[in-house]
């Protein structure tokens, strides 16, 4: 399958394929935090992220969630549907943590009575600012119907993920999703789902996600390997 690099990101390289509606996503060993301010090459990270994300997306597909995932091609590659990415990071929070705790001056780990969905404008120059529905419409990113769908679909995905992670003894604190328009103009889940873009805590409150790298709490791949081993118990 011939391929040409069309985009190089912090965590993945994206390549064309012979089918104009399909792309290959290649996962890198690079770890970044604070919008790329902190970065490091960590051997084995790309393989683990691809394994975890492929596994989660396969389960989401089977549960009826429309995603860009087609198949895992190799240790670091997966075949995806080509989408036009919506420039929003859709964050869902089940518990207080991270920037939410800092913004509102509250402790981490407080259960939210109703999960909170937040939007962040994907713009590196602006440092991905926190925005609301009215900003989304002003920027012509999405209309009312599309905004409602993004929130509803994110909440539906959350209900699935919470159950799966609870089954393996992990608490889903929060996560970030990205969506895009497929060739038919339908909004589908894109990007990835791995400990890079979610927070997972074990029963003792230990971080099982990229906060290990952000906060210098230990070896990133050791933690990701534990998450991957636990996920395989769901098979």
UniProtKB/Swiss-Prot annotation:
Record's keyword terms, sorted: ATP-binding, Ligase, Nucleotide-binding, Purine biosynthesis
Disulfide bonds: none
Gene3D superfamilies: ATP-grasp fold, B domain (3.30.470.20), Phosphorylase Kinase, domain 1 (3.30.200.20)
Catalytic activity entry: 5-amino-1-(5-phospho-D-ribosyl)imidazole-4-carboxylate + L-aspartate + ATP = (2S)-2-[5-amino-1-(5-phospho-beta-D-ribosyl)imidazole-4-carboxamido]succinate + ADP + phosphate + 2 H(+)
EC annotation from Swiss-Prot or TrEMBL: 6.3.2.6
CDD domains for the chain: SAICAR_synt_PurC
Domain of life: Bacteria
InterPro entries, A to Z: SAICAR_synt/ADE2_N, SAICAR_synt_PurC, SAICAR_synth, SAICAR_synthetase, SAICAR_synthetase_CS
Pathway(s) the chain acts in: Purine metabolism; IMP biosynthesis via de novo pathway; 5-amino-1-(5-phospho-D-ribosyl)imidazole-4-carboxamide from 5-amino-1-(5-phospho-D-ribosyl)imidazole-4-carboxylate: step 1/2
Gene Ontology MF, one: phosphoribosylaminoimidazolesuccinocarboxamide synthase activity
Enzyme class (EC, first level): ligase
Single biological process term from Gene Ontology: cobalamin biosynthetic process
KW Ribonucleoprotein (keyword) present: no
Cross-referenced Pfam families: SAICAR_synt
HAMAP family: SAICAR_synth (MF_00137)
UniProt similarity note: Belongs to the SAICAR synthetase family.
Cited NCBIfam families: purC
Name of this chain's protein: Phosphoribosylaminoimidazole-succinocarboxamide synthase
């Amino acid at each position: 399958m011939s391929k040409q690099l069309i985009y190089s990101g912090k965590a993945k390289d994206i390549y064309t394929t012979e089918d104009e509606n399909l792309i290959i996503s290649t996962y890198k060993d690079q770890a970044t935090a604070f919008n790329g301010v902190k970065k490091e090459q960590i051997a084995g990270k790309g393989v683990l992220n691809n394994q975890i994300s492929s596994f989660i997306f396969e389960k989401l597909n089977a549960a009826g969630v429309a995603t860009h995932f087609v198949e895992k091609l190799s240790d670091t590659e997966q075949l995806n549907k080509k989408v036009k990415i919506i420039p929003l990071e859709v964050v869902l929070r089940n518990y207080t943590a991270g920037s939410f705790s800092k913004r509102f001056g509250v402790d981490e780990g407080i259960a939210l009575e109703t999960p909170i969905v937040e939007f962040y404008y994907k713009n590196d120059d602006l440092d991905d600012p926190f925005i609301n529905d009215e900003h989304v419409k002003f920027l012509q990113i999405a209309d009312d119907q599309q905004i409602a769908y993004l929130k509803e679909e994110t909440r539906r995905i959350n209900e699935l993920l919470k159950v799966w992670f609870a089954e393996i003894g992990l608490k889903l604190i929060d996560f970030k999703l990205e969506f895009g328009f497929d060739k038919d103009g339908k909004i589908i889940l894109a990007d990835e789902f791995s400990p890079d873009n979610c927070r997972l805590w074990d029963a003792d409150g230990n971080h099982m996600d990229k906060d290990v790298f952000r906060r210098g709490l230990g070896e990133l791949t050791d933690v990701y390997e534990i998450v991957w081993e636990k996920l395989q118990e769901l098979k």
